C-alpha cells in the first residue's frame, strides 16, 4: 500500500469527508482527550489550527489535527481508519508532516504505563521523537477536568 498520501485541510463541517473524519476522531479518542463539536468548529476558525484529512486516493485514511506555534508545530491528534491500520499510514503521514514543518514538531501522549500508551510511545520513538523528562498534567478538553 505505497500510494501517495495527501493532506487536505477541512475548513468546515460541510467539507467532503468531514463526517467520516469526525466519526474517526470520536472513535479514536476518549472524551477527555477530544473537544466537543462546538469547540472544534471554533478551533477551525483559528488560523493557527489545521484539521487535515489524510487521503489515500479518494479514501479518507486518517486525520491529523495540528497547531502552528512560533517556531514549532504541535501535532494534537493523529488517527488512522481502522481498516487501514497496520499499513504504515500513520508513520508515513507523521514523517511527511515532520518533513514539511519549518520547526520542531511536538506532541504528547498519556503516561506510558501500559498497553496502548506504551505502544504509542514506541511508535513515536521509532519515528525519532524523544521524551521530555518534565512532569505535567494535561487538562481535559471538556469539563469536568
Map each language-model feature to its residues:
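Conserved GNAT acetyl-CoA-binding A-motif
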Residues: 100-115
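Conserved acetyl-CoA-binding loop-helix of GNAT-fold acetyltransferases
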Residues: 80, 86-99
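A conserved beta-turn-beta hairpin within the catalytic core of GNAT-like acetyltransferases
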Residues: 67-76, 85, 103, 142
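Conserved beta-strand in the GNAT
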Residues: 53, 58-68, 72-79
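Short, intrinsically disordered, charge-balanced linker/junction segments flanking boundaries
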Residues: 139-145
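A short helix-loop-beta-strand connector motif used in the catalytic cores of GNAT acetyltransferases and
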Residues: 43-53
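Conserved active-site alpha-helix within GNAT-family acetyltransferase domains
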Residues: 111-134, 138
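Short amphipathic alpha-helix that is part of the acyltransferase structural core
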Residues: 1-39
Amino acid at each position: 500500500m505505497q500510494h501517495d498520501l495527501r493532506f487536505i485541510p477541512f475548513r468546515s463541517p460541510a467539507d467532503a469527508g468531514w463526517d467520516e473524519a469526525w466519526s474517526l476522531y470520536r472513535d479514536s479518542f476518549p472524551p477527555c482527550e477530544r473537544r466537543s463539536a462546538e469547540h472544534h468548529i471554533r478551533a477551525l476558525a483559528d488560523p493557527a489550527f489545521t484539521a487535515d484529512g489524510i487521503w489515500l486516493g479518494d479514501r479518507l485514511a486518517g486525520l491529523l489535527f495540528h497547531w502552528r506555534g512560533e517556531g514549532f508545530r504541535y501535532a494534537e491528534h493523529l488517527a488512522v481508519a481502522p481498516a487501514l491500520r497496520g499499513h504504515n499510514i500513520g508513520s508515513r503521514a507523521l514523517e511527511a508532516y515532520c518533513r514539511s514543518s519549518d520547526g520542531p514538531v511536538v506532541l504528547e501522549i498519556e503516561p506510558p504505563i501500559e498497553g496502548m500508551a506504551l505502544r504509542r510511545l514506541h511508535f513515536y520513538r521509532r519515528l525519532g521523537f524523544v521524551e521530555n523528562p518534565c512532569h505535567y498534567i494535561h487538562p481535559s478538553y471538556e469539563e469536568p477536568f
